Structure formats: structure tokens, C-alpha cells
Amino acid sequence: MAQGEAGSLFLAINPGARANGMGEAQIGIANDAYATYYNPAGLSNLSNKHFSFMHTSYLPNLVDDMAYDFLTFAMPLRENSAIGGHFTYLNLGDQISTDDNGNELGSFSSYMYALNVSYSQKVDENSSWGVNGKYFYQELADLSNVDAATGSVAVDVGYFRHNAMNNPNLTMGAVLTNLGPGVSFGDGEEDPLPTRLGFGVGLSMLEGAGNLALDLNYEVNDQAMVTNLGFEYFLVENFALRAGFMNDPSGEL
């Protein structure tokens, strides 16, 4: 990667059916176990335990053996606080290593994982803050002559507010993600983490059956603004229709 471009990009893969159905707009409406990823301050919105798991083929049009897994849980501790966590695993599949002459040196598997612990605390009736601490590890090769494994740590901090601008239907969130030291695979070049500064708002409408969400995420290393817009409408308590839009200049989406 060129200097200044972020590494450890698997940390920026956004999980969850709800989020992906809403253009990944979640910062200002985070209220379930996926708040451990999108905005840890949103964990204070929980009134009971949440658990979720997802598994998906990743980039199936390019390779047939990449897989992404995300496991998350969250629970209220007391009336004013909550804890949670998630585990992320990205399997890049099997690859063949060759020398400069094209001779095969053997096959190897590449994978990455992250273990995250979350905590949220209410400041007052309408406001809360949250923090994530995470350890992540990446192994891009498992060969005796190749040093391509590294691990590091990072933190996220978030804020969530109900009754924003004195509107009982308006919520607001802010989050700084993947703040930590860069990573190096032993080649002397250090890649920064995919740090983002995000702001989101949510609007409850249609007597609480609908939610409109808008996120603005500034990618620090790419110096690009990502816009996420989503809407959901609950036909019944646990069944919703969702639509979303995302504009990512750096990813050309």
C-alpha cells in the first residue's frame, strides 16, 4: 500500500442485515448488539440481552473461498450502563506461493480476526457515552521464509443522545473508530488503521413504525467523506422493510 493509505481494512467491513439494508447508516440509531461495532454509546439503549451472528461469502465474484463471520452480544448491566462485545473473522482462503521464477513454494491460508469488548454508560436521561477496546491479528502467509503476520490494538469512542434539539423523535450519535498505532508486516513500512470520524442522526416517524437515518463518515487517511442514508418500516414488531443508499468516493460507490 502507498504511504498514507490505511491497512487492516477488514476492521471497516460493516456487519449486520439491518445496517446493510439501510445503506450502513447506524450511528444515530444504534440500539441493538451491533452497537458494539457502529456506536458503543448506543448500548445504553438496551433493555435486555441481545445476541447475533452472521456468516457470508465475501467477494464471491472474485474468489470462491473467502468468508466473513461476525458474532456479537450485548446486555444491560444496571439501569445506567451496558456491556457487550464482538468477534470478527475474515478467512481469505487458500493461496499458492511462488518464487521469482514462478516455481511453487507451497500453499498457505490467510486470515484476520478481531476481538472487541464494549462498555457504555449513561450521562443523564438523554445522553450516553461508550468505548470499545479491541485486539486484532492478521496472518497473510504461513511460510518459513515469509514474515507476514502482525497484531495490534485499537479503541473506539462514541456518544449517543435522545431528544436531540429538544425533539423527542430525533436521536444523534458521534463516533471515532479504529484509533491506534499503525501495523507493519516486518517490511519496515507501517500502514495506519482505517480511522473514521462519524456523525449520525435518526428520526422516528409514522408513530414509531418508521426510522430514517443519515450518517456522515470522514475517512481520516483517505480524506474522503462517506454518506450513508437509510430507512426502515416495521410491518410487525420483528419484520421490517428497509432501503438504503451509500456514497463512498474512495471506493467509487
Regions found by a protein language model. Name each.
Residues 3-253:
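Subset of outer-membrane beta-barrel
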